[in-house]
Every structure is written in C-alpha cells, then in structure tokens.
UniProtKB/Swiss-Prot annotation:
Keyword Transmembrane helix: no
A Pfam family this chain is assigned to: GFO_IDH_MocA_C3
Species in which this protein is naturally found: Rhizobium rhizogenes (strain K84 / ATCC BAA-868)
Protein name: D-apiose dehydrogenase
Gene coding for it: apsD
UniProt keyword annotations, A-Z: Carbohydrate metabolism, Magnesium, Metal-binding, NAD, Nucleotide-binding, Oxidoreductase
Amino acid sequence: MNMTELKGALIGCGFFAVNQMHAWKDVKGAGIAAICDRDPKRLKLVGDQFGIERRYGDAAALFADGGFDFVDIATTVQSHRALVEMAAAHKVPAICQKPFAKSLSDAKAMVRTCENADIPLMVHENFRWQTPIQAVKAVLESGAIGEPFWGRFSFRSGFDVFSGQPYLAEGERFIIEDLGIHTLDIARFILGDVATLTARTKRVNPKIKGEDVATILLDHQNGATSIVDVSYATKLGTEPFPETLIDIDGTQGTIRLSQGYRLEVTGPNGMTISDASPQLLSWASRPWHNIQESVLAIQQHWTDRLSSGGETSTSGADNLKTFALVEAAYESAANGRTVDIGAML
C-alpha cells in the first residue's frame, strides 16, 4: 500500500468478506490495513490469505489504536448499530453490509448518528452496481424507450444458498430481507422512489423457517407500476442464479434483460440486442462473478467519493428508502393491506 492510499479496516471475516478483501486489493486509491473478527480461526485465515499484519479480536481495541481512514463493517446485522456508532464516536467514515439494521428505527438512528458526527456512511448495497443493471439504467436514461410506465424485477432460482450460509434457514425472515432487499433497491434505482407497496409471501421449502417466495407490487412516485418477484423455490431447466431479470415498458419501446445477460432494446428505430455480461475478475468464480464484480464497483465508488467529498449512491440516507420497502413488504404480507411508504420515512 503506498502512502497516498486511503487505509481501511475490515470488521468481520466471514463468508462474504473474502470477496470484499479481494476487491480492496483491486481498488485504486485504497487498501485494507487492519482486520477484526471475534473468531481467531477466521482472523488467521483471512489475515494470512491477504497478508494483513494488524489483527484484532475486539472492535473497541481496533478503534482505540486507529491508524485508518475508514471502516468496512462486514459482520451480521446484530452488531451493525453498535459498530456504526463506534465508528461515529471515533469520527471514522463507515461502510456497512446489508441488511443495514434490525429495524427501520435502528437504521434511522444510525444515519442520524453519522450525520451528527459529520462522517460519510454507505450501505454495501452492491446489486445496483452490477454491469447488466447499470446497462439497463443507461438505456433508460438515454431516452431510447421514452417514459417508463411498467417494470418487472425478477430473481427466481432453485440454488442452494443454505449450504454456504446455513443461518439463512434459521431466521423468521428470509428471502425479502436477504435477497429481496437488493431487488427492491434495483426497482428504486431504475424507476425511482416508491409511494405504496403491496406484498404476498409463501414458504415452499418445509426445512426452513422463513419465506422463500415473495411477490411485491410497487406504485412508484412517478406513476410507474412495477413487480418485484423473488424465489428460492423455483426449479428451472437452466439455473439463472444469481441473475436479476428485468422487463421495462416505456412509452416509446421496451427493455428486456433476460437470462445469460442478453439485453434487448426495442425503440422507434427497431430492436438492438447486446451482451451485458459482467467481467470475470481474476479472483472471481462463476456464477458469482456478477456479484463479485459489483463488489469491486461499489468499493471503488466509495473510495472515489471519500477522496472527492461527494455523497455515495447508496448512502445511509438513501438506503433508508430501500430499507423501508423491506419493512413494508413484511407488514403488507402479514396484514394483507397496502402500505404507504412516505408515512414510514
């Protein structure tokens, strides 16, 4: 790491943090100087793999020693609020893994704490940074299909996510909190903020506690309507994991992002088909490479914004609007009613 690079500290050396560590090695202008985990085995594993000398079993000790410009919090949700508040107390800019908080009130408090401390806070919400998602957004912004009035954001899979992350089978909440949060964020990113939401959930797999299927209807503030549908109980001939498929209808044409990263755009001048595939980074492996590339993209974005002083695309304040959609989806599924998002924020 050269002297001008921003130095980061990573807290939490679990399943997904390895992707973050790989990406930090590729980020221009930043790198990881210290790591922290309560599990000595994981600490040693990640420390040895990435050659990190400074290792801590306790976050308080890490912050007390200091010597870093930002912290990347990659722990599970239970510790997020305490760690974000610790970062704010030490005036250290923070990235926080999703789900951001245990509740919307916790999330609001964390955003407020960082605003009061005058430090940037970004939620590691990487799906909107995937190459195919950015490609859809670029087409829409070019005006090629006119004004969008309808959309569908779909993630249906039979992939076994439980072997790598067994805790996913244990929670009362599953697919909306773990995956739907990303799909809802994509819907916001592409079609704008949401006025009202209606949701239905189902549990198909009898071996898990939470819901593994969700269908969510969104009324966007700009008048567009969209459907977010997610499932881990869908058995297909060709497994699409971890692809998000997108349909957008506009006043002048349509966008279709289909399986295999095929991007079809139909407008007044006819149809074009292109390949929106992500890059396979040197450390990435299929089929995860789509997500792995977006980890690098969001961490580069954080580094650029931290250097220039601008707000990040998925700042804590912005992410409250996605987090509210998750809470609203559970509320709507429980009581069968449509939820007003504005009233929650």
